[in-house]
Amino acid sequence: MTEIIEAIKESAKRIAKTIQTTDFGYSDSANESGDQQLKLDVQSDLIIEEELSKTSSVRVLASEEKSEPITINERGKYLVGYDPLDGSSLVDVNLSVGSIFGIYENDFHGNSLKAAVYVVYGPRVEMVISTIKAERFILQNGKFLFMEELQLGEKGKLNAPGGTQQYWYPHHKALVEDLFSQGYRLRYSGGMVPDLHQILVKKGGLFSYPGTKDKPRGKLRKVFEVFPFAHVYEKAGGEAINDEGNRLLDLKAEEIHDTTPCFFGSLYEINKVREFYGK
């Protein structure tokens, strides 16, 4: 496990430098989800594959940018699912973006996730590593230095509602409006990593990406995005559930790009989700 996290650290350093120096134009290909791939997406994916391929403990790599997992070492113990540059379209407007990693054993189901890591590329580069607890690090002088253990309060003040509003179901719209009526502040950049990171650092709130009329199974992918952040939020004392009120880490990935509605937050906000969703 340690060598995997060290490889992720090296990947993050290289990606941070790439963001500073690379053309932001689009490549000629699209990823498995149909999104046109930025050159940064492609480069970030190659960097991560290169660094993780140096390890002896990784058996399989699954990238959000590729249609199928690849086996790199038959004797390896772990499977790594990752989104190399989540929110990459925000780079050209100079907003924060991130990388997300899930370290699995045996398969890519939620209960097989052993650790999660994400990186925020913003005014400074930060990393959160979630194993037994969720710990925050900052990149300084080429090294990731420990900052703090992340711990959510029971109730927060931030609301990050994803999905196109015109396609929200009435009960979800009522949930969002209820939180705003309580004085919750809107914090939504369109980047999953910085939005979820802000809620963690500010010690509470709700990030939601529901099932909608146009995307009833949600948009966010279990293996690459949802399961890793569910792990982080649980280790930080919060909860992460789907629209049925089920724990996200109890879900299975029916295929590598499987999606799900998802809600991440502190205890109060998740109970509000259950209330408005009748769960």
From Swiss-Prot:
Q: What class of enzyme is it?
A: hydrolase
Cellular component, GO, one term = cytosol
Residues annotated as binding substrate: D86, G87, S88, S89, Y188, K219
- EC number from the UniProt entry: 3.1.3.11
Q: Which cofactor does it need?
A: Mg(2+)
Write down how the cofactor binds this protein. Binds 2 magnesium ions per subunit.
Amino-acid positions noted as binding Mg(2+) 1 in the UniProt annotation, renumbered to this chain: E64, D83, L85
Question: Which compartment or compartments is the protein found in?
Answer: Cytoplasm
Gene3D superfamilies tied to this protein: 3.40.190.80, Fructose-1,6-Bisphosphatase, subunit A, domain 1 (3.30.540.10)
Q: Does ATP-binding show up as a keyword for this record?
A: no
Could you mention a single GO BP entry for this protein?
gluconeogenesis
Q: In which pathway does it act?
A: Carbohydrate biosynthesis; gluconeogenesis
* Reactions accelerated catalytically: beta-D-fructose 1,6-bisphosphate + H2O = beta-D-fructose 6-phosphate + phosphate
Tell me the residue numbers annotated for binding Mg(2+) 2.
D83, D86, E225
Entry's Gene Ontology molecular function annotations: fructose 1,6-bisphosphate 1-phosphatase activity; magnesium ion binding
Write the record's keywords in alphabetical order, separated by commas: Carbohydrate metabolism, Cytoplasm, Hydrolase, Magnesium, Metal-binding
Matching InterPro entries? FBPase_C_dom, FBPase_class-1, FBPase_N, FBPtase, SBPase
The main location class comes to cytoplasm
How it assembles, according to the record, is:
Homotetramer.
Q: Which PANTHER family match?
A: FRUCTOSE-1,6-BISPHOSPHATASE-RELATED (PTHR11556), SEDOHEPTULOSE-1,7-BISPHOSPHATASE, CHLOROPLASTIC (PTHR11556:SF35)
Record-stated family? Belongs to the FBPase class 1 family.
Full protein name = Fructose-1,6-bisphosphatase class 1
Species this protein is from: Nitratiruptor sp. (strain SB155-2)
Report which gene this protein is encoded by: fbp
